[in-house]
Amino acid sequence: MAKLNRKLRQDSTDRYKTKLYLWRNLGGLIPEDMAISVTESITADWKQYNDMMSKVRNETLDILKTNKVATEDYIGYIAFAEELAHQVWKNKNSSPDPNTANEASKTDLESKYSDVYGLDVTVLDAIYNAVIPIIMGGGS
């Protein structure tokens, strides 16, 4: 238990995730090494996803500044980028043909955001072209 307690003192995020895993699995009656390794694996997955989403947001902001988009419209474009990135992430991990699925997602989201929210299609295309390499290429 000392090893687990040392781990719990390191970081509040790890502490929370480890406790959550312990509480949800057999009332905490699992080996501590298993809890630690699973927590580290989950944390690594979340970190990879969150790092990619952060890159998507930063790239989107650069595109919006380059195209001189009004500041009040930023939230719509960022929402489009995040929703698109999430769809691309899901397609990458589950679809047999992610490129076709990505094009379908782009078409659906683009029509939604341009027709309903009145966003510029050329900016949406630029965001799409920036999001695809970030997510499909692993975040570069």
Curated annotation (Swiss-Prot):
Q: What does this protein do?
A: Self-assembles to form a helical, filamentous nucleocapsid mesuring 900 nm in length and 24 nm in width. Together with capsid protein 2, wraps arounds the DNA and maintains it in an A-form. Capsid proteins probably maintain the DNA in A-form by non-specific desolvation and specific coordination of the DNA phosphate groups by positively charged residues. This certainly protects the viral DNA under conditions such as the extreme desiccation of its host.
Q: Return the protein name.
A: Major capsid protein 1
| Comment on protein domains | The N-terminus projects into a DNA groove.
Predominant location of this chain? virion
Provide GO CC annotations from the record. helical viral capsid
**Record key words, sorted:** DNA-binding, Virion
Originating organism? Acidianus filamentous virus 1 (isolate United States/Yellowstone)
Per its UniProt record, what Gene3D superfamilies does this chain match?
1.20.58.800
- What is its quaternary makeup? Heterodimer composed of major capsid protein 1 and major capsid protein 2.
Record Pfam families = MCP_C (PF21660)
UniProt GO molecular function? DNA binding
- Protein location: Virion
